[in-house]
């Protein structure tokens, strides 16, 4: 009987010890990034590029719209060949705008490349700082609460966002 009690105690202890060793923390990467001036500069640059590209696309779409309106008013006076030519011109203009939109904002577009070039290095530094902090302080899991992640409650003492900023050399 004594052996069974000792064995059960050892099994219980073996099950409880690993649970106590796990430490959790969380960070808010949106907050961290908002405190990094280089990130804000990169975001501003991306916004300016995006606005310029959007204006370029809108200009092409406006040209197509003007061609279409002009075509509609002159349609009755045009031969079938001229109508077909104008319709083709309008479609080419619209297609050109769509291609430009794809070039700038598509899955492998300029915007994505610029984000990779400007934003990713900053995000990588933040990620590395989180990893370093986790290793130094013994956290097994670090959650990110940015963007409304599914964390229902987190004790503010476990928020390590300011510690990450400090590790990156920024004060809050």
Predicted feature locations:
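Sec-dependent N-terminal signal peptides
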Residues: 4-15
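Short, exposed beta-strand-loop hairpins at the edges of beta-sheets
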Residues: 152-154
